[in-house]
């Protein structure tokens, strides 16, 4: 069972990623500061990489858009990197 997303953008991205992929135990999230923005790195199983990126990058773009909206609510900048 997937737990509801918490108020942090990191937890929200993890929640969405686990809902999309098949190998939920292989979803890894890392977060670090890079200058004036917080970078969230998302790593999934190689077989699920296509699901996270989506056709023509639509899913990845949607994840970044959601992250941007959450960041503007918190007055912070966030970036999403998908690790291959």
PLM regions and their residue ranges:
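Glycine-centered tight-turn and secondary-structure capping sites
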Residues: 53-57
